[in-house]
Amino acid sequence: MKQRNSPAMTRRTFIAQAARAAAVAAAGGGVSVAKPVLGEVKPALYSVTYLGLWYLGDALTLEQLLERAKRFGYQGIEIEAKRPHGFPLDWPAKRCEEFRKRVADTGLAISGVAAMNDFSSPIAEHREAQLANVRDAIRMTADLGARVLRVFLAWPGAHRTPEGGGRYDIAQKIWDATHEGIPETQIWSWCRECLVEAARMAGDHGVTLALQNHKPVIKTYHDVLRMVREVGSPHLKVCLDAPIMENKEAEYLRKAVSDVGGLQIQSHFGGEYERKTPGGPILRPIVQSQWGAPYARKGYFQDNFYLPFIQALLETGYKGYIGYELCHTLPVVNGKTVGIDFVDSNARLALEFIRETIAEAKRRLVS
C-alpha cells in the first residue's frame, strides 16, 4: 500500500483548486492548472468473514478465500492473524513466499494482516505473550509483502458456540472482570509501552502498524490520534473505520477523516446486505446481536453514512483499501445458524454497495 507524505487535502482546498482550474479554462488561458487529485479507495475481502466462526460450516482456506475474492470482484484480501487462516506459527517464510506469489498471479493484493492482540492486561506475562505474538505477525506480514498490520490496544476476543456461530459476550465478561478496579490511566500506559516496542519491531521489518478505532480502551477516534502521538513512531499509523465510530453524523465523520489525514492507511466496512427484488436497491439491516443478545433486526439504515466518510477519504488523498468484514452473531433459520450461502450473498452485495458508494462519492466531488 502506498504511503502518503503530502498534507491532507481539505474540502476547502479541493474546491479552491477546482475553481481555479475552471476559471483558467473559462478564460481560455494557456496556463496549465493541475486538476485536484482524488484518492483511490479499493475494496478488499477480510478473511474473518470466512473464518468458520460466525456461520454454520467450515472455514475456507486462504486459497479458497482468494478464489472467492477474485470471482466476486474484490481487489485484495486481508488476512486475520489467527487459525485457521493466518496464525504466524503456521506461516514460515517459504509458505508466505508461495502464497504471496499465488496472490500476485491472480492480480489481487494482500491489503494487510490483522493482529488480534490485547496489550491491556494487568498481568505482565499476558502482555509479553501478546507482544511476542505481534512480533511474529510482523514477520509474517513482511514475508507476505503486505506491509500493513492492523493492531488493537485491546481485543477481548470471541468464541464459537457448540451449536455453531460466534459470540463476543463471554470474552467481554472475562475482559471486564480482569480490568475491574484498574485505573484507565494505567491501562493506557501498558498499551503504550507495548505499542512502542511493537512499532520499533515493525520498522525493523518494513511494516507499518495501523491502530484501529476499536473499543474497549479506545472510546473515540481522538484516543487513536492521542496514542499515535504519544508513541511517536513513523511505523504507527491509523485504521479508521466508519461502522464503529462513536458518532456517524456526516459532519463528524468528515472531521474525523480530516483530523486523521495522512495517517490513515487502512479502513473497513461491514454489516449485512440484502436485496428484496431483482435489480432492486441494496438494503442494510440494522442488526443488534453482540455481547450475547439474541439476533434481532431493528429496521434498515435510512442514510448511507459511508458516503460522507468515503468522500472525505477521497478528498484527503487516501490511496488504500477498505475491507469487508462480516463478524457478528448471525441469524438462526429453522433452528440453525445460517451457513456459508448467507455469507456469500452478503459478500457479493457488500461489494456492489461499496462500489456504488465510492462511485457516488467521486461524482459529488467532480460535479
Regions found by a protein language model. Name each.
Residues 2-148, 157-159, 166, 177, ...:
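N-terminal pre-domain/capping segments
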Residues 301-315:
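A short, acidic, amphipathic alpha-helical segment used as a generic capping/interface helix at domain edges
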Residues 152-173, 218-219, 224:
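Active-site-proximal loop/short-helix segments
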Residues 48-50, 80-82, 115-118, 154-156, ...:
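Active-site beta-loop-alpha junctions enriched in small/polar residues
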Residues 1-2, 322-339:
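Short helix/strand-capping connector loops at secondary-structure junctions
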Residues 76-77, 113, 184-188, 192-304:
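Acidic/histidine-rich catalytic cores of soluble enzymes
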Residues 108, 207, 316-320:
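A short helix->loop->beta-strand "cap" motif at the edges of active sites that frequently abuts
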Residues 162-179, 280-289:
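Active-site gating loops and adjacent loop-to-helix segments of metal-dependent hydrolytic enzymes
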